[in-house]
A protein has these predicted regions:
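Hydrophobic faces of well-ordered beta-strands that scaffold small-molecule active sites
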Residues: 36-38, 92-94, 138-140, 232, ...
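Substrate-binding/active-site clefts of carbohydrate-active enzymes
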Residues: 41-90, 97-221, 226, 248-254, ...
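Conserved, well-ordered alpha-helix/loop/beta-strand core segments that scaffold catalytic motifs
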Residues: 223, 230-233
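Glycine- and other small-residue-rich loops at beta-strand/loop junctions that grip anionic moieties
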Residues: 237
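The feature marks proteins involved in alpha-glucan
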Residues: 1-35, 48-59, 64, 68-69
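Carboxylate/His-rich catalytic cores and anion/metal-binding grooves
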Residues: 33-46, 277
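Noncatalytic carbohydrate-binding groove/subsite architecture in carbohydrate-active enzymes
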Residues: 268-277
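Aromatic- and carboxylate-enriched substrate-binding clefts and catalytic-loop regions
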Residues: 252, 260-265
């Protein structure tokens, strides 16, 4: 017995704790820890150029609704950068700014253009330059789980059905994608494709499709390389496959190692926090 106890004592908890390899540990860029973020819903923040506001824009200060527009734009944000700096913030997280039909812009039409009613790519480029001069970081909201129903990619599927080049970019149960009934009768029980949150205007992307994946990754390359953004906030990240997020991280970190990646996870986040997503 004494000999057996001595042998056991030599183990010193061997195998009781896992060995953590550096590559498996999630590293948050050091600058993030000292960043005070300010979230901006662009349409509601400041109208810098009324001439680019959407048609039917509400008078500033009107009661907000789910669908109305107030006319806020990126020029307005530029006008208020000194004010934001005085508040003590040093990071701006923007709700989606890419071209779309809604005020919230989670229904993307074109991922490669800032919505013209927000000032387009020129306004965004100017904003980045002016923010960086003040030491303010910029994080964009990336919606890679779904597209908007007005996206040319989705409209091609609507028109051409199974013959569309993009038919496999979405999770479609059968064609045609829309039911043969008046639109007033459509609901999540009778349309023929997967969506985000049962919202018919947001068809869900199939990120297992190689072309679809590469399209989305090309968006990341474009904005990170050409506009030097500092972070990506990933909308409903838990609804996009892990393989895609691993590729996403590699693309981002190859371009800008200090770029911040933040995922929206509505439940236990551990599977996304292993250093590879």
């Amino acid at each position: 017995p004494d000999c057996e106890e001595r042998e056991l004592s030599r183990l010193n908890n061997f195998f009781c704790f896992p060995y953590l390899n550096k590559i498996d540990v999630l590293n948050t860029p050091s600058w993030v820890k000292n960043t005070v973020w300010y979230q901006i819903f662009p349409d509601r923040f400041c109208n810098g150029r009324p001439e680019i506001s959407p048609e039917g824009v509400e008078p500033w200060g009107s009661a907000p609704t789910s669908f109305n527009f107030m006319g806020g734009d990126l020029w307005g944000v530029i006008d208020k950068l000194d004010y934001l700096e005085d508040l003590g913030i040093n990071g701006i997280y923007f709700c989606p700014i890419f071209t779309s039909a809604s005020n919230h812009k989670y229904d993307t039409i074109d991922h490669f253009s800032v919505d013209p009613h927000l000032g387009g790519n020129i306004a965004f480029h100017t904003l980045i330059e002016e923010a960086h001069k003040r030491g303010i970081k910029i994080m964009l909201d990336a919606v890679f789980n779904h597209l908007g129903a007005d996206s040319p990619i989705w409209l091609d599927v609507v028109r051409n059905g199974a013959n569309s080049h993009y038919a496999d970019w979405f999770w479609i149960h059968k064609f045609p994608v829309y039911p043969d009934t008046p639109k007033s009768e459509w609901d999540f029980k009778n349309f023929n494709y997967e969506t985000f949150g049962n919202v018919i205007e947001m068809p869900k992307l199939n990120t297992e499709n190689e072309e679809c994946r590469e399209y989305l990754l090309s968006i990341v390359r474009y904005w990170t390389q050409n506009f030097d953004i500092d972070g990506w906030r990933l909308d409903v990240a838990n609804e996009v496959d892990h393989h895609f997020w691993r590729d996403f991280r590699k693309v981002i970190k190859d371009i800008k190692p200090e770029c911040y990646i933040l995922g929206e996870i509505w439940h236990e986040g551990t599977p996304w926090l292993r250093g590879d997503q």
